[in-house]
Amino acid sequence: MSGSAAIMKAPAKSEFIIKPENTKAEVDTSNWPGLLKNYDKMLIRTSHFTPIPDHGSAPWSRDIKSYVSSGVINLDKPSNPSSHEVVAWIKRILRVDKTGHSGTLDPKVTGCLIVCIDRATRLVKAQQGAGKEYVCCIRFHDTVPGGEPAFAKALETLTGALFQRPPLISAVKRQLRIRTIHKSRLLEFDNERHLGVFWVSCEAGTYIRTLCVHLGLLLGVGAHMQELRRVRSGVMSEDDGSLVTLHDVLDAQWQYDNNGDEALLRKVIQPLETLLCTYKRLVVKDTAVNAVCYGAKLMIPGLLRYDQGIEQGEEVVLMTTKGEAIAIAIAQMGAVELATCDHGCVAKVKRCIMERDLYPRRWGMGPVASEKKKLKASGLLDKYGRPNEKTPASWLQSYKDYNVSSSEAPALPAPAGADAAAAPSTPALPAPEEKNESEEKSADASDSKKRKKDETAEEKAERKRLKKEKKEKKEKKKSDKDE
């Protein structure tokens, strides 16, 4: 072997040792559906909880009956029928109890109309106040001086907070109101045909018809709305692949009724959780879910995770670890307090969405609640859990009922070892005379009849005459109506 030949060295032993690491593989949740999207980016309050796998299910895994009754449809409303007619047709096709929509569209207007079914109708109010986007075709009454640049400038001018009065033919009172135009963009313009097409993103309740009239006034030629289409309502738009027609809904229900195929029905209907993706989230332990459904406040021990940037007084959505929406709530703490506090109220329920008893009851099973049950069973507390003369002093000192204010709290019973000699030697005052119950009732009755007793005979006769005339007039009116 020549000296220039490379000599392989034995590698150090340490290079083959796998060292222990205090890390774990990260899960990419950016593609998870609904409320579970970016779950790994939420801040962790605690990771310890008792899962209840036999109750509840992921929104996309519900049985078909629950799926339909907790669903929403992003419907492409056809021209001519009113929004109420369309919603009534959906109700009849799907054979459900309740339906509602996210905001009325005029009969001639087409586009996104979010139809909520049964449980999802609880979200209708929130969706009616969500932002909207429209594409509008405007017809000018004459050639626009300045052409396309003038039209684009007028659109830019009519951006921001605007005064609007509803059109002459409208379902609301014609009061002056302020509505905000967030953005607008010119799409097409034909000055020879006196037509223009523009896109607008605006606040709920904005009248595009009124906006077209204002554009005509600003350009000095007059204008009116020719056609209108809503392209986005809240979080749902015509580009996200969820837009369906009435024929699609009818076909999906027919397939399920005749062939038992629910695939098309699941494609047409979306879970209600899709409407809540813009809310900040609070993840609730499975054991606390049913208490929240019964109206309880969410407390710190029931919180698992929370989104960044939550502020006090903000609307948030309470969700389970499976991605189900429990309720819309008002946050009582900000994100900083949620990270540092060890007790307190996290959120108060504003609108409950989930049905009661979908998850089992888990309240009243802690050490304090168990002790309270024992005391009630042995007669040391009354049937409502309030202290009585037999209540031990240790319980009175340690237990605080947060549902009762300090002014309403019952007086604590005197300890058993209290000595009569400890009382001051002042002479006992005579007890005030107690009124009999029957005497109080008779006094109330006499007060109510005081007016009749004080009146003279002439006043009494006049009162009776007026009463008789009123009665005869009423009977005559009734008989005329029957004829």
UniProtKB/Swiss-Prot annotation:
Catalytic activity: uridine in 5S rRNA = pseudouridine in 5S rRNA; uridine in snRNA = pseudouridine in snRNA; a uridine in mRNA = a pseudouridine in mRNA
Protein name: H/ACA ribonucleoprotein complex subunit CBF5
Subunit structure: Component of the small nucleolar ribonucleoprotein particles containing H/ACA-type snoRNAs (H/ACA snoRNPs).
Gene Ontology process terms (BP): box H/ACA sno(s)RNA 3'-end processing; cell division; mRNA pseudouridine synthesis; rRNA pseudouridine synthesis; snRNA pseudouridine synthesis
Low complexity composition-biased segments: 409-428
GO MF: DNA binding; RNA binding; snRNA pseudouridine synthase activity
Segments forming domain PUA: 279-354
Location of the protein in the cell: Nucleus, Nucleolus
Biased composition (Basic and acidic residues): 432-462
Organism the protein comes from: Chaetomium thermophilum (strain DSM 1495 / CBS 144.50 / IMI 039719)
SMART domains: DKCLD, PUA
The encoding gene: CBF5
Key words, A-Z: Cell cycle, Cell division, DNA-binding, Isomerase, Microtubule, Mitosis, Nucleus, Repeat, Ribonucleoprotein, Ribosome biogenesis, RNA-binding, rRNA processing
